């Protein structure tokens, strides 16, 4: 019985010395062409889903962001990249989590909304407004000669004839070879949810120098100037279009040129992946200390990508100060004698 095969994943390795045996994941399989993708690639494998928080379940920093600055994060693992390039952005751009209507997009609890107040003015050729996710080690692990990656997502817009573009960057890390653009496509959105697929052809890694923290960057472009049109498969500029909403749901990136069906992760698994890069530790309290020379205490947390940047916010009483930070814990110090209350929160940032 023939089985469906997915091209370009290169999971089927044929041992020509034995024509009836296929080596698959270092194990011999009989009957040659066996490659049932959903069975053999777990959701945890980057080849199956390299996007983190593709179902927009995790929002540790908040649920609504009004006029976020370029480089700031919104939903976990997503950040804004904005270059007005001499123009004026719409007076209000809001990024928010919205509740999905059951049955509209199967398996989605939430979706990502960008609400725009007006079209903005005066954008030059180099202007852009993107929503970005960076995939850690994505260039090293997913890119190369003859390799492709496929992004799939649902989208809609209440703005008539609004376009959305998708493209990528192959980044070799700090001190590595120059960044390379992976040209994609653009789509004209309707008011109904539609699924869209974009396949990016990646570049050869031969002769390239890798620095620290190589990444594959995936960009959802909401506005672009004429100088940036080619990278989303267009030849003209695209403005914000006017007042209205742009909605995005169920973002996925698969290795190869096939958009596999979206499979939501368990929330606990998705949260754990997000917390490798950022974690918000809710209110903690230390009370009734009497140590004039100071007290050092430790807070443990889920291991981070690197030792995080720590932001301490005092809720009540005396604020602790940071003594040291490690990938899975921080040491804090209280130096005032006779402390009756120290209530605080911690933000731990280890983003790329």
Regions from the PLM with identified roles:
Residues 1-41:
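Extracellular "spike/adhesin" assembly and maturation modules
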């Amino acid at each position: 019985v023939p089985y469906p095969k997915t091209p370009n994943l290169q999971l089927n390795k044929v041992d020509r010395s034995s024509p009836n045996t296929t080596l698959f994941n270092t194990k011999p399989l009989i009957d040659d062409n066996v490659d049932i993708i959903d069975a053999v690639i777990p959701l945890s494998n980057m080849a199956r889903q390299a996007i983190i928080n593709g179902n927009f379940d995790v929002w540790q920093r908040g649920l609504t962001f009004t006029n976020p600055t370029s480089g700031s994060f919104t939903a976990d693992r997503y950040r804004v990249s904005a270059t007005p390039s001499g123009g004026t952005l719409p007076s209000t751009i809001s990024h928010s989590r919205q509740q999905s209507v059951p049955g509209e997009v199967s398996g989605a609890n939430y979706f990502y909304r960008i609400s725009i107040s007006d079209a903005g003015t005066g954008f030059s050729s180099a202007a852009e407004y993107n929503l970005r996710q960076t995939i850690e080690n994505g260039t090293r692990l997913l890119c190369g000669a003859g390799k492709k990656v496929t992004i799939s997502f649902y989208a809609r817009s209440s703005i008539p004839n609004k376009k959305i573009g998708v493209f990528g960057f192959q980044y070799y890390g700090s001190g590595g070879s120059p960044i390379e653009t992976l040209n994609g496509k653009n789509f004209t959105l309707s008011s109904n949810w539609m699924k869209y697929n974009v396949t990016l052809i990646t570049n050869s890694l031969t002769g390239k120098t890798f620095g620290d923290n190589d990444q594959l960057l995936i960009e959802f472009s909401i506005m672009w100037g004429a100088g940036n049109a080619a990278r989303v498969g267009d030849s003209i500029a695209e403005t914000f279009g006017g007042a209205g909403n742009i909605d995005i749901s169920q973002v996925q990136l698969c290795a190869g040129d096939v958009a596999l069906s979206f499979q939501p992760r368990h929330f606990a698994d998705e949260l754990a992946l997000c917390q490798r890069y950022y974690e918000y530790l809710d209110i903690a309290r230390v009370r009734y200390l009497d140590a004039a020379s100071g007290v050092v205490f430790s807070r443990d947390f889920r291991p981070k990508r690197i030792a995080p940047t720590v932001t301490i916010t005092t809720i009540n009483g005396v604020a602790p100060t940071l003594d040291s930070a490690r990938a899975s814990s921080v040491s804090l110090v209280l130096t005032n004698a006779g402390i009756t209350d120290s209530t605080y929160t911690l933000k731990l940032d280890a983003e790329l």
